[in-house]
Amino acid sequence: MAEVRVGKNESLDSALRRFKRSCQKAGLMAEMRKREHYEKPSVRRKKKAQARNKKKRYA
């Protein structure tokens, strides 16, 4: 979980910006998007195989 401490003279906007950046670095937004809808394990495997084939094709 991302945590940001707000300084005495720090504006809320800059603290929010730092929080968003830390969430981005931690990969929370991508994880949230991935878990937004349930994905069956078979579909997950199929997508993983397609990504692997695509990567192999362009490598």
Curated annotation (Swiss-Prot):
GO terms for biological process: translation. InterPro entries: Ribosomal_bS21, Ribosomal_bS21_CS, Ribosomal_bS21_sf. Residues 43-59 have a biased composition (Basic residues). One of its GO terms (cellular component) is ribosome. Keywords: Ribonucleoprotein, Ribosomal protein. The keyword Nucleotide-binding does not apply. Residues 27-59 are annotated as: Disordered. Residues 31-42 have a biased composition (Basic and acidic residues). GO terms for molecular function: structural constituent of ribosome. Belongs to the bacterial ribosomal protein bS21 family. HAMAP family: Ribosomal_bS21. This is Small ribosomal subunit protein bS21.
